[in-house]
Amino acid sequence: MPCRYVIDTEHGLVISTAWDRVTFDEVNAHQNRLAEDPSFDPDFKQLVDATKVTDLEVSIEEAKKIFGRKTFSAASRCAFLGKGLVILGMGRLIEAQAALFEGRESVRVFSDRQKALKWLGMENLP
C-alpha cells in the first residue's frame, strides 16, 4: 500500500506519506488505520507528503468524502505537500473544501517542505 504515517507524539504531528499510484480505497484505509491507532490524537497537526505520488485515482466526489470524514479535529491544521499539476490541484480542492465548510484556514497546499512545516509551527523539525 503506497500510504504510511508516522505519529510524532512529542510534537503533536502526524506525517502521512504517499507514493506511486494512490487510489481512494488506499487513502480511506490509511485514514482508518490512523483513526484506530492508540497514539493518534485528533488535535495533532498533519503533514501530508504527496511529493512522490505519480498517479492519484481519486475523483472530486471521493476527495469530498475523504475530507468529510473529519479524522482530525476542527482545531487541527493540515499542510499538503505536493508536486505536479494534478497532485497540487487535488490539494487545492481539499484546501477550498476546508475553507468553505469550516470557514477557516485549516488546510494549505505547499510545494516546499520547510514552508509547510513553518505554517504548522514545526519549523525546527528536519
Q: Could you describe each region identified by the protein language model?
A:
Residues 1-126:
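Amphipathic, Lys/Arg-enriched alpha-helical "gate/interface" segment within cytosolic domains
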